[in-house]
A protein has these predicted regions:
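Bacterial N-terminal signal peptides that target proteins for export
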Residues: 4-26
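Short, solvent-exposed loop/turn and secondary-structure capping segments
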Residues: 132-136, 199-200, 281
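Short, structured coil segments at secondary-structure junctions
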Residues: 137, 206-207, 292
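Alpha-helical, coiled-coil/dimerization segments enriched in small aliphatic residues
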Residues: 277-306
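Bacterial Sec-exported substrate-binding components of ABC uptake systems
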Residues: 40-129, 240-266
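Extracytoplasmic substrate-binding proteins
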Residues: 120, 164, 177, 181-275, ...
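A short, structured surface patch at a secondary-structure boundary
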Residues: 84-90, 94-180, 186-193
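Bacterial N-terminal signal peptides
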Residues: 26-37
């Protein structure tokens, strides 16, 4: 009887050993699967932030464009994947890419690459400053082509007084060393730069992209105002720019719908030398008077843009 008991006891012990093994194996397998799934999930989450460039320019095409109401001196095209092509005038093109994305293969040398949002701007075109102020994007400007005393906009003057924006020389004599040391991402020049093309060429040789602000060439007065939409794209504040532009257009809708009053108006200014300048009929001031329902005089002042 004792032998039978001992045999049964040994059998129970032998059967008890393998019984725990499947449990441990199942637990190990479940743990391994959970680790694999976690790894897959981590890789999926990380992939978007590691985008560099898998594009070839020849295979890329616009999927949409900014619907401009008045401006004709710039255009903005959407190429998908947060890639934007900006054209200024007839030939200056800029490809605005997400941060850390490299340029597409086969991109023509005539297209300048910018990384969004554009930072440490060297702002020479004074007419653009108001747009940056309204967009609350002064922090994207590091350098100014106008001295502190030359600004009539209090926000710009204060930024220079506080050292947030530094003077880097006027359009014809920029401080190249200061511009380079500031890691300048873009120089926004006025059309005066066309009188000193060697400066533009030198900036570009140093790797500083140059965008010439052509709002003064707009045929419609409200085309100038629409440039805020371009600066919204450059600074990553598209929604703010659209809202500001819409608000301004809406506020003028009643005026634009008015029947011409038949009243005449003249506009002139006195220069530092004491001479009197009269705006010509093709000037934006004359067109603004016409939009308001008036008639600009003198009517035989010519049709050129300048005074």
């Amino acid at each position: 009887m004792d032998n039978i008991k001992n045999h049964l006891f040994r059998q129970k012990r032998k059967s008890a050993i393998p019984c725990g093994q499947p449990v441990r194996w199942i637990a190990a397998i479940l743990l391994l699967l959970s680790m694999i799934c976690a790894g897959c999930s981590a890789k999926t989450e990380e992939s978007p932030s590691n985008i560099t460039s898998a594009h070839n320019w020849d295979d890329m095409a616009p999927v949409g464009s900014m619907d401009l109401l008045y401006a004709d001196q710039f255009s903005v095209e959407d190429y998908g994947d947060d890639i934007t092509l900006i054209t200024i005038g007839e030939s200056d093109r800029f490809l605005l890419l997400p941060e850390n994305m490299s340029a597409p293969d086969g991109l023509p040398d005539s297209i300048t690459v910018l990384q969004k949002p554009v930072k440490n701007i060297y702002l020479v075109a004074t007419s653009a400053m108001d747009a940056f102020i309204r967009l609350n994007a002064l922090d994207s400007i590091a350098l100014s082509g106008t001295k502190e005393s030359g600004w009539y906009l209090p926000e710009a003057k204060s930024a220079m007084e506080e050292g947030k924006i530094a003077y880097a020389g006027k359009y014809s004599a920029p401080d190249y060393e200061k511009i380079l040391n500031s890691s300048c991402g873009l120089a926004v020049e006025s059309t005066m730069i066309y009188h000193t093309p060697e400066v533009k060429e030198q900036l570009e040789r140093l790797g500083i992209p140059v965008l010439v602000e052509r709002s003064s060439y707009e045929n419609h007065p409200l085309g100038r105002m629409e440039w805020i939409r371009l600066y919204g794209v450059l600074t990553g504040k598209e929604e703010e720019a659209e809202a500001i532009f819409k608000q301004n257009v809406d506020s003028l809708s009643d005026v634009l719908d008015m029947v011409p009053s038949g009243k005449t108006a003249a506009f002139f200014y006195v220069t530092n030398s004491g001479s009197v300048n009269v705006r010509k009929n093709g000037d934006y001031i004359a067109k603004m008077i016409a939009l308001a329902g008036g008639t600009y005089v003198p009517e035989n002042g010519g049709s050129d843009e300048n005074a």
